[in-house]
A protein has these predicted regions:
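Short, charged helix-capping/linker segments at alpha-helix termini
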Residues: 16-27, 35-57, 174-175, 198-199
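Amphipathic alpha-helical segment used for protein-protein interaction
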Residues: 33, 120-155, 162, 170
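Short, Lys/Arg-enriched C-terminal cap helix and immediately downstream tail that follows
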Residues: 34-37, 41, 97, 146-151, ...
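Structural recognition of an alpha-helix C-terminal capping motif at a helix-to-coil junction
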Residues: 49, 53-60, 75-87, 180
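DNA-recognition helix of helix-turn-helix
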Residues: 139-141, 150, 159, 164-196
Length: 199
């Protein structure tokens, strides 16, 4: 995948009917959103509902609503996905019958009864999926070793795409405090990643 392709370009291509553009968007944001969803779900909910189920529902909702999305800045798409993820997680907590919801969502794909629906997206081979899941598990373990304050600012900045000002407002702290905490958190996280890579 070409990471040089901008989110704005991919959104516009999808709006013009390029289904492959959505697959590229999915690939570009999958990992960030997976981490975000993991930490937004309660342990109890994660025990009953797979993060991947939530992600699939988020991306289905995004595909259906992307025509109404307006790109504003580099963080706006991730912020939009984050809002969809929040809604999806709340919905999952209220409704435990995941199979019924999945069937309803899948009916929207192209079929004999819906010939104009989008094609189901083939995201990856089984070996690629396994490698991505293993990589995601390592990332989550490394994030879990951080103090809660560090983990929170990293999630807000790098996975939700909030600016320092937005994080400051969200946490009720000064911009300088947030910037310093984020700097320290990222430094600590890099150290943890390097240590894990050596093992």
């Amino acid at each position: 995948m070409n990471f040089q392709t901008s989110t704005c370009d991919l959104v516009e291509r999808f709006k013009r009917g390029d289904q492959a553009a959505f697959s590229l968007l999915f690939g570009k944001y999958h990992r960030r959103l997976a981490v975000l969803v993991h930490y937004k779900m309660s342990e109890e909910l994660r025990g009953r509902v797979e993060v991947d189920d939530i992600l699939q529902d988020v991306f289905l909702a995004a595909a259906q609503g992307l025509g109404r999305f307006t790109y504003q800045n580099p963080g706006s798409f991730m912020a939009w996905l984050s809002r969809i993820a929040n809604d999806t997680i709340v919905d999952a907590a209220r409704h435990q019958n995941r199979k019924k919801r999945r069937a309803e969502e899948l009916l929207r794909f192209r079929s004999e009864s819906n010939p104009n629906g989008p094609e189901p997206i083939d995201f990856a081979t089984p070996s690629r999926v396994f490698a991505q899941q293993e990589s995601l598990q390592i990332l989550l373990r490394n994030l879990d070793t951080l103090p809660a304050e560090y983990r929170e600012v990293i999630l807000l900045a790098k996975f939700e795409g909030l600016t320092t000002s937005e994080i400051s407002e969200h946490l009720g702290k000064s911009r300088e405090n947030v910037a310093l905490t984020l700097h320290r958190a990222l430094k600590r996280f890099r150290e943890i990643q390097l240590k894990a890579d050596r093992q």
